[in-house]
């Protein structure tokens, strides 16, 4: 029918054209997995082009949203800014500075959640090294960038984030002029208009983020500790343990590129509660009070406010046994428990109406025993009442 097919994908209409989709952006994005950063699933290279299969978000650019709707209310501005800063913090923790943060590079999904995109100007940071490249959009660029001075990297993203916050709250830019030299002077002076309707608390945050001297400029730590920013802050944005991930990833599967693409597409697009999960009525059965359903607060819960949440039930003592054996478990539904790190099988026996016997059996031990012609009945059992 005349359509072009690349790998498993059929090309549709061209939505836009960019000039920085090169190897650096590909290397950066393929490493990233964060709820507020656009995901790169796959890269297909041809002699003339590089095709990047990326996450689709339907809400368009934050810039277009502000132009159409004007300034956002303080609560909504804070929610989006918290999400953006969480993504920026993730970049910096992985030694990447974006360098071109602006509303045009922040996309919105179907639930009005922010997604940072376009890492074409990003740069990998190294300890002790400074950058000099003047890049990014002038209205959002920090004074040290437009003046050609050396900069470490993270501080320029803080400045740009401050400009985005101002745009969210005011619907305009803090520094703007059609005459570029005049615009640069305004940025280097660091003086901007603060409307009377702005909360004094957020004004203090803006002034700290838009500090001309990068040494005095707010850090992510400063912003996170600011009273205005901490209001209604979702826990998942800045977990206490940065290594924590709500998704348990099979490293072996990710080594296979086609499997990796399918794996992440399924994880990112499924409903958090699987189709195999029992209806709410199942959770009312007193026999299941010993078998917990997954009820931990997760990014997906926070990002989809319309999703009905299940009521929690009491955790079973079996979880203590699994942890004691150094296993990691994930409850898919009340009758399906996934365990990783050591290959093992679990079987649940009902002893009577109130007692169950949970049988842990090592698959490897069973295979070895069968190979030696021995009985494979040895197992670890735990009584659950």
UniProtKB/Swiss-Prot annotation:
Query: What class does this enzyme belong to in the EC scheme?
Result: transferase
* Single GO molecular function: histone H2BS36 kinase activity
Name the positions where ATP binds. 15-22
List keywords of the entry alphabetically.
ATP-binding, Autophagy, Biological rhythms, Cholesterol biosynthesis, Cholesterol metabolism, Chromatin regulator, Cytoplasm, Fatty acid biosynthesis, Fatty acid metabolism, Glycoprotein, Kinase, Lipid biosynthesis, Lipid metabolism, Magnesium, Metal-binding, Nucleotide-binding, Nucleus, Phosphoprotein, Serine/threonine-protein kinase, Steroid biosynthesis, Steroid metabolism, Sterol biosynthesis, Sterol metabolism, Transcription, Transcription regulation, Transferase, Ubl conjugation, Wnt signaling pathway
Note on domains (UniProt) = The AIS (autoinhibitory sequence) region shows some sequence similarity with the ubiquitin-associated domains and represses kinase activity.
**What is the documented function of this protein?**
Catalytic subunit of AMP-activated protein kinase (AMPK), an energy sensor protein kinase that plays a key role in regulating cellular energy metabolism. In response to reduction of intracellular ATP levels, AMPK activates energy-producing pathways and inhibits energy-consuming processes: inhibits protein, carbohydrate and lipid biosynthesis, as well as cell growth and proliferation. AMPK acts via direct phosphorylation of metabolic enzymes, and by longer-term effects via phosphorylation of transcription regulators.
According to the record's subunit comment, the protein's assembly and interactions are: AMPK is a heterotrimer of an alpha catalytic subunit (PRKAA1 or PRKAA2), a beta (PRKAB1 or PRKAB2) and a gamma non-catalytic subunits (PRKAG1, PRKAG2 or PRKAG3). Interacts with FNIP1 and FNIP2.
Indicate what this protein is called per its UniProt record: 5'-AMP-activated protein kinase catalytic subunit alpha-1
């Amino acid at each position: 029918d005349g359509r072009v097919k690349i790998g498993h994908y059929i090309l549709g209409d061209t939505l836009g054209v960019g000039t920085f989709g090169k190897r650096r952006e590909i290397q950066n994005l393929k490493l990233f997995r964060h709820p507020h950063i656009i995901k790169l699933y796959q890269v297909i290279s041809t002699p003339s082009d590089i095709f990047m299969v990326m996450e689709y978000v339907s809400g368009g650019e934050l810039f277009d949203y502000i132009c159409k709707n004007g300034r956002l209310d303080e609560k909504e501005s804070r929610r989006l800014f918290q999400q953006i800063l969480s993504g920026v913090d993730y970049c910096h923790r992985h030694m990447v500075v974006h360098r071109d943060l602006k509303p045009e590079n922040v996309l919105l999904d179907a639930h009005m959640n922010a997604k940072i995109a376009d890492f074409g100007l990003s740069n990998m940071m190294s300890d002790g090294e400074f950058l000099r490249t003047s890049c990014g959009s002038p209205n959002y660029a920090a004074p040290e960038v437009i003046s050609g001075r050396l900069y470490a990297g993270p501080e320029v993203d803080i400045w740009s984030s401050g400009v985005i916050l101002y745009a969210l709250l005011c619907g305009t830019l803090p520094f703007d002029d059609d005459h570029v030299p005049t615009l640069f002077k305004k940025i280097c002076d660091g003086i901007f208009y603060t409307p009377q309707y702005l909360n004094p608390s957020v004004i203090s945050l803006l002034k700290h983020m838009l500090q001309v001297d990068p040494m005095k400029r707010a850090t992510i730590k400063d912003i996170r500790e600011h009273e205005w920013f901490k209001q209604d802050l979702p826990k998942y944005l800045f977990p206490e343990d940065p290594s924590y991930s709500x998704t348990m990833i099979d490293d072996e599967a990710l080594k296979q590129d086609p499997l990796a693409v399918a794996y992440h597409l399924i994880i990112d697009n499924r409903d958090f509660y699987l189709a195999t999960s029992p209806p709410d009525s199942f959770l009312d059965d007193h026999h299941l009070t010993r078998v917990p359903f997954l009820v931990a607060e997760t990014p997906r819960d926070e990002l989809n406010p319309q999703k009905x949440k299940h009521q929690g039930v009491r955790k079973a003592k079996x979880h203590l046994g699994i942890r004691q054996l150094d296993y990691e478990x994930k409850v898919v539904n009340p009758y399906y428990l996934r365990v990783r790190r050591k290959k093992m099988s679990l079987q649940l026996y009902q002893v009577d109406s109130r007692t169950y016997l949970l049988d842990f059996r090592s698959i490897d031990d069973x295979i070895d025993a069968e190979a030696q012609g021995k009985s494979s009945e040895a197992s670890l059992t735990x009584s659950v009442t």
